[in-house]
Amino acid sequence: MDSLNGKAGKTMIDSHGRKIDYMRISITDRCNLRCQYCMPEELPSIGHTEILRFEEILEICRHAVSLGITKFKVTGGEPLVRKGCLSFLRSLKTMPGVEQVTITTNGVLLKSCLSQLEDIGIDGINISLDTLNPEIYEKMTRRNEFSQVWDAIVATQASKKRTKINCVLLKGINDHEFFDLIHLARDYQLDVRFIEIMPIGYGKGFEGFDKKDLLEKIAEKYPDYQVE
């Protein structure tokens, strides 16, 4: 990082000359799913006394704003399982200097929280969904929660809230659904993002696809689609 100025209104610039204006915040390591490429069925959680309190996270965010950060992406684990998440989002959204707050969720608890997220003024919702097949979903996540996630996606459409779907394609597991997920983007006016699996930790046992291969597949079948 070549430039770092702590004065309010200044910005951070990386070594490629790009402005750094967003921060990703993981507010919990806990999750109500057990995706095979992410975490095991049994995983000890970090104790509440060992993680940052929301007040401490907000203090970090205030300092980040003074360095030019205006956008915050809240993730986990599954952020909605942490008690007080919605109050935290409200405080972050109303913090002076903050222009955008989005949340990434697996969608299991989303429908019940959607009206509150709208009231908070959340700027975007990213939903992690790797398959449209309930049986494959249960196999991948070790949980039978597909209907709750799908209902949440439908609910976001009714609310007109900006929604994106994050999908990890794995060879031999859900890769045959590639174009079904493309059609989901078309039919529901959603942004679908295919994320490369990280070959670390529990992801080492799975084979994914690289970005170039996926872009070529889309461009070949749908030359008029906008892909990036």
Residues covered by each model-derived region:
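Radical SAM/AdoMet-radical enzyme domain recognition
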Residues: 51-74, 81-189
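A C-terminal junction/extension of Radical SAM enzymes
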Residues: 187, 191-228
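Residue-level signature of catalytic and energy-coupling elements of molecular machines
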Residues: 27, 117, 192
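Canonical Radical SAM [4Fe-4S] cluster-binding loop centered on the CxxxCxxC motif
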Residues: 15-54, 67
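Short, small-residue-enriched loops and turns at beta-alpha junctions
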Residues: 27, 46, 78-82, 170-173, ...
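Flexible, acidic/Gly-rich N-terminal and inter-domain linker regions that tether
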Residues: 1-24, 30-34, 219-226
